[in-house]
């Protein structure tokens, strides 16, 4: 029986995809994948969804039923508890829009708060094995780069995340993990060339009941260098001042707020934020969310 099931596995997988509304055809990609079955586009499916879809296909096979007709059962699996990455960043399926998952996280493009001065890394490479009458560089090129101070912003709709994960503990752990990843992660492109392994000068985390609020407009006027005061430090102070303006003029008082600052206390943040280390911030955030769910 297991041998027969193994031989039918690919066909069953194809029928499951058909029940979900996805078209499967022979791949025209070059290499070893050419001719193998593939969907028209990439589909983000969580491991727990794969397991449940496989169980459904096996049960249908054992009962002699056609899993390709089990559209309701397949849809229920896609609408069940989501994996944290899908719950955070969403999933769009053009052929099956009813299976789409709205993202509970939003991540803004980082932008420079100061004036950028492009610089260029000029490099040459010489062929050590070239003949004596073939002098000169084998390669000459430049790589553009800049060293800017960035403002980064992201927000998570915790209620929406809880609805998709359907688990209080997973929601709390997911939010805390997202905060740490957002703070510490850096783009990996060109890291060997520029070693851009930096951590933020300042991190502000707020819990709000009303709406997410970005302070991007604090830097509409670029930060300019001053003697003895770094751009990043000026940016931190301006960020706090803008948040204070929002609190005073819009009445947007956060439920809880923390900040991490490597350059010492920030006067404009001390009025409404608790200064902590990142580990303490994560622990306090975790305790606050757990208390909210247990209330």
Annotated model-derived regions:
Residues 1-295:
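Basic polyanion-binding and macromolecular-assembly surfaces
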């Amino acid at each position: 029986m297991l041998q027969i099931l193994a031989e039918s596995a690919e066909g069953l997988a194809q029928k499951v995809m058909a029940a979900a509304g996805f078209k499967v055809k022979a791949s025209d990609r070059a290499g070893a994948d050419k001719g193998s079955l593939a969907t028209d586009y990439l589909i983000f499916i969580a491991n727990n969804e794969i397991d449940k879809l496989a169980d459904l296909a096996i049960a249908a096979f054992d009962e002699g039923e056609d899993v390709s007709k089990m559209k309701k059962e397949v849809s229920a699996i896609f609408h069940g508890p989501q994996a944290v990455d899908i719950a955070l960043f969403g999933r769009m399926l053009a052929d099956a829009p009813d299976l789409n998952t709205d993202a509970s996280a939003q991540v803004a493009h980082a932008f420079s708060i100061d004036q950028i001065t492009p610089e260029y890394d000029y490099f040459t490479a010489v062929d050590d094995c070239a003949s004596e009458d073939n002098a000169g560089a084998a390669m000459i090129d430049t790589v553009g780069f800049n060293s800017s101070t960035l403002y980064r912003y992201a927000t998570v709709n915790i209620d929406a995340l809880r609805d998709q994960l359907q688990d209080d503990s997973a929601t709390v752990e997911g939010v805390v993990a997202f905060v740490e990843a957002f703070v510490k992660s850096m783009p990996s492109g060109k890291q060997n060339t520029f070693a851009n392994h930096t951590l933020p000068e300042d991190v502000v985390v707020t819990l709000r009941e009303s709406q997410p609020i970005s302070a991007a407009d604090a830097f509409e006027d670029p930060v300019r260098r001053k003697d003895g005061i770094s751009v990043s430090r000026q940016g931190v102070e301006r960020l706090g001042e803008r948040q204070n303006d929002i609190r005073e003029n819009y009445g947007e008082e956060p439920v809880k707020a923390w900040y991490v600052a490597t350059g010492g206390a920030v006067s404009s943040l001390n009025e409404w934020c608790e200064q902590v280390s990142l580990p303490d911030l994560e622990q306090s955030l975790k305790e606050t969310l757990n208390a909210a769910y247990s209330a």
